């Protein structure tokens, strides 16, 4: 690619740098050296790094300030000139910068919000107006330079200006800057190239299909997503080569990358490095990484020059490791977005899972390598680095995160040891399979047989069943237990079942998965499938906020033991009482949590709470139609009272309110229509404004099953004009409403009102759990669940009272699970299967006592559950109800389980 050399500016900059170095040598200053000789102006018109860099040490690993230089023909107030200097200061994480055009010099300090303030201007050389004057008045500007250096040095001595360690700049700022500057233009280049190359377009489409879930809420444009992959591929290869080149001389040729090289020639350089040093997963090129605009390629060359000319070779091993970890963190944010495994969670997963640290460990969906890195670090406390690395294996179906994983798993003391890292689909792993990696000491191929593993630990991918890739579906169809799993099972369900193939008998599987299995039929079937291969040893959830803070996903940890015989074991359900951040800051608490789980004993309830069940107890509890989510909250008591409760659907018909869509048509606002009264029915649209346990439908619903022709005959112009108002409207994607709303056997504008509710409750409730009764049976819409009593249970008042007991509140919570934002995932099927206290077991005297207490409850407003259970009226009611059923001793247990479930669900918002 073409190089544009700044002749005059460059030569004068070199003179300036030489003069600064002479000043620094002759004086005892904070400023020890100047550099920047390798900066080349590119066709882009702006470079990533300053023309002159002031350093705080001779090794050039502490950067103090960047200067931007121009000749006198560029005014000192030129906006581009000023902004370039300030942009580069931000990129280098500095709080000052200086611009100089030999006529004037101006010093800026960075303030809050990345704004800059001018704090000093030097005017002594304002007689320099032309390029020729720069030579003529050399002695003048050299004298001015000494004054500038002395004054700038004073700002550093006073602490007003801060420095930036090279490691911090590289890991935190530079890679982010590369992404910001180049993502869009590389994406545009990819899009244009793909238009001319259908194979390239097909590749990016296929790649995007396989990784789209990993970019949720981060990138929606496949070309921008792949552009980030290309940027990170170049940046990490360049950085890693510069870091290892002084220990791995084969990597020294990275210094050959310059503006005269093309991307393909640079790829060839990295191929040579791989042949001599291994790290194939780091140095291999992602496909189409050469499809770079010239401006982007110049940025990568400048990045390499910056690393080469600065003091990266003088950094100690700890700093180099921090650079690697920082660049890995930046890359993870760019690649995985919100699904990157937090370091503390990775460490805990490994510690909870591994029984024998001398045995082999595998992460079958390693992503960017957080989990295997933690496994290696723990092993190294009792093993040699070589033994640790060679007993931790990792693979991922996708190649793109393996570069970061290899860097993540590499430390200074393991740089000559080949990571057991390879590309592979977790669904097709088999013991004895041949895996090829390069020996970093000899450069030759190592062919290794995949061993049986003592432990598999992984954060399994969050890929819902709707978007499981076709090749994975093919593998799934061959699985022996596929018929046990639900057809709507997410990808992690299949991986968890299939990975048993490579685990030793009595070996362990520890996985992070979505909490969706806790409250679904698919989850029940997943547990049945897993029990074919494993004992379910531990299940962990957080009672103190989501583990993945940047995602609306709530997760669980499963620890399973591969069966050696058919013996059944107890399952421990652990509810963590401390957040990941609290555990990371408190090693004693972390050890307590891990030791509690390993010993199957609750050592400290302030750290983690244990609910333990035998398999027969779990079966009995699940048969009472609660979901797995309830088992974290000590619900063994439920088995004791099963003869005193009855499913709600034995007492009531349960249905979801009418669901038609397009509320503006079906729920007209008063005063906006002339619809005839016979076509209007009272409806309750939602329960947000319901404040008491007796309610009134407060809106109108348009319920008209009469044809247009019949309406015309009847002269019902109000209904006709209302229908005509919507007949020409379209939905959000441009389809006509009559087509969108058409239903077999119905007019397109027809809303049926066949099911009238006596009692209702909410879909997906939050902090208020209640069943309200209509004064007059009414129509409900899709946001509500309606109930009408069955003839066998005619006592509507008693039924309503028992529905509103604390026990039924418990059941609502126990029948669902918390979504990512803390709302309870409950539908009409959950409610229908909930149990309530059996009305037939209530004596006449007890009935009167219950209804008397319930009248007081109906007279006041509905409260949040936590407030209800502190209220005297509520507590009196609950004690009377439980006494009527001989369950007074269960008050505290029911209350504790209910509040624990609510509190845990609420923390998902945090």
Where do the PLM segments sit?
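Acidic-basic catalytic patches of nuclease active cores, encompassing PD-(D/E)XK
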Residues: 1-41
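Signature of N6-adenine DNA methyltransferases within the class I
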Residues: 44-47, 78, 92, 104, ...
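Charged, often flexible domain-edge or linker segments that flank or initiate folded functional domains
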Residues: 50, 55-57, 61-86, 90-291, ...
């Amino acid at each position: 690619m073409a190089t544009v050399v700044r002749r005059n500016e460059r030569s004068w900059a070199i003179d300036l740098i030489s003069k600064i170095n002479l000043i620094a040598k002759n004086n005892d200053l904070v400023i020890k050296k100047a550099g920047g000789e390798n900066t080349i102006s590119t066709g882009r018109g702006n470079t990533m790094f300053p023309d002159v860099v002031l350093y705080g040490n001779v090794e050039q690993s502490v950067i103090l300030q960047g200067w931007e230089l121009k000749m006198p023909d560029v005014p000192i107030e030129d906006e581009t000139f000023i902004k370039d200097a300030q942009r580069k200061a931000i990129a280098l994480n500095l709080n000052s910068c200086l611009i100089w055009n030999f006529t004037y010099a101006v010093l800026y300090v960075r303030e809050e919000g990345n704004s800059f303030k001018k704090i000093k201007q030097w005017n002594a050389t304002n007689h320099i107006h032309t390029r020729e004057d720069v030579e003529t008045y050399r002695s003048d500007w050299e004298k001015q330079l000494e004054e500038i250096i002395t004054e700038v040095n004073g700002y550093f001595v006073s602490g007003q200006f801060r420095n930036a360690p090279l490691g911090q700049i590289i890991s935190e700022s530079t890679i982010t800057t590369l992404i910001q500057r180049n993502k869009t233009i590389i994406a545009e280049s990819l899009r244009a190239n793909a238009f001319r190359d259908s194979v390239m377009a097909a590749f990016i489409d296929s790649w995007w299909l396989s990784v789209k879930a990993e970019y949720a809420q981060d990138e929606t444009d496949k070309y921008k997503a792949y552009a980030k992959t290309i940027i990170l591929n170049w940046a990490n290869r360049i950085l890693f080569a510069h870091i290892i080149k002084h220990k791995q001389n084969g990597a020294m040729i990275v210094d050959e990358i310059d503006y005269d090289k093309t991307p393909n020639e640079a790829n060839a350089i990295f191929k040579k490095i791989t042949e001599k040093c291994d790290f194939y997963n780091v140095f291999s090129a992602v496909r189409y990484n050469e499809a770079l605009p010239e401006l982007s390629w110049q940025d990568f060359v400048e990045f390499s020059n910056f690393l080469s000319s600065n003091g990266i070779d003088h950094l100690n091993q700890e700093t180099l490791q921090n650079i690697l970890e920082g660049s890995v963190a930046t890359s993870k944010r760019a690649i995985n977005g919100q699904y990157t495994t937090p370091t503390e969670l990775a460490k805990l997963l490994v510690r909870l899972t591994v029984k024998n640290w001398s045995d082999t460990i595998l992460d079958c969906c390693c992503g960017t390598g957080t989990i295997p890195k933690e496994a290696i670090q723990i092993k190294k406390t009792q093993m040699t680095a070589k033994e640790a690395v060679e007993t931790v294996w990792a693979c991922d179906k996708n190649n793109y995160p393996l570069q970061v994983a290899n860097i993540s798993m590499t430390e200074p003391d393991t740089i000559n040891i080949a990571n057991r890292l390879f590309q592979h689909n977790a669904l097709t792993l088999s013991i004895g399979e041949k895996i090829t990696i390069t020996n970093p000491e000899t450069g030759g191929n190592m062919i290794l047989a995949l061993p049986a593993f003592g432990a598999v630990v992984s954060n399994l991918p969050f890929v819902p069943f709707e978007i499981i890739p076709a090749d994975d579906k093919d593998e799934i169809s061959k699985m022996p237990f596929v018929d046990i799993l639900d057809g709507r099972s997410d990808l992690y369900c299949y991986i968890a079942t299939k990975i048993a193939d490579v685990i030793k008998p009595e070996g362990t599987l520890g996985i992070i998965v979505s909490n969706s299995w806790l409250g679904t039929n698919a989850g029940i079937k997943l547990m049945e499938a897993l029990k074919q291969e494993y004992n379910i040893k531990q299940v962990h959830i957080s009672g103190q906020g989501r583990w993945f803070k940047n995602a609306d996903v709530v997760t669980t940890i499963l620890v399973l033991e591969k069966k050696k015989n058919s013996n059944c074991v107890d399952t421990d359900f652990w509810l963590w009482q401390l957040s990941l951040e609290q555990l990371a800051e408190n090693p004693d608490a972390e050890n307590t949590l891990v030791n509690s789980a390993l010993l199957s004993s609750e050592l400290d309830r302030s750290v983690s709470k244990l609910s333990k069940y035998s398999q027969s107890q779990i079966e009995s509890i699940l048969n009472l139609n609660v979901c797995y989510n309830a088992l974290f909250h000590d619900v063994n008591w439920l088995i004791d009272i099963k003869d005193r409760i009855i499913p709600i659907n034995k007492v009531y018909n349960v249905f979801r309110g009418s669901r038609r869509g397009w509320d503006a048509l079906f729920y007209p606002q008063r005063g906006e229509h002339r619809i005839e009264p016979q076509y209007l029915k009272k409806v309750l649209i939602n329960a947000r404004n319901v404040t008491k346990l007796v309610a009134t439908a407060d809106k109108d619903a348009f319920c008209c099953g009469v044809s247009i022709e019949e309406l015309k005959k009847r002269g019902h112009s109000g209904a006709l004009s209302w229908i005509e108002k919507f007949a020409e409207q379209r939905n959000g994607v441009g389809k006509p409403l009559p087509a969108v709303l058409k239903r077999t056997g119905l007019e397109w504008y027809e809303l049926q009102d066949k099911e009238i509710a006596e009692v209702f409750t909410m879909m997906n409730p939050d902090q208020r759990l209640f069943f309200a009764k209509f004064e007059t049976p009414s129509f409900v819409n899709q946001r509500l669940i309606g109930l009408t009593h069955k003839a066998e249970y005619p006592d509507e008042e008693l039924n309503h009272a028992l529905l509103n007991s604390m026990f039924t509140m418990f059941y609502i919570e126990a029948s669902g699970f918390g979504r990512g934002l803390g709302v309870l995932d409950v539908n009409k099927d959950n409610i229908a299967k909930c149990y309530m206290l059996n009305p037939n077991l209530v004596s006449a005297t007890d009935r009167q006592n219950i209804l008397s207490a319930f009248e007081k409850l109906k007279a006041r407003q509905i409260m949040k559950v936590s407030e209800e259970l502190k209220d005297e009226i509520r507590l009196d009611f609950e004690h009377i109800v439980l006494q009527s059923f001989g369950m007074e001793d269960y008050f505290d247990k029911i209350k504790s389980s209910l509040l624990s479930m609510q509190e845990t669900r609420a923390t998902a918002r945090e």
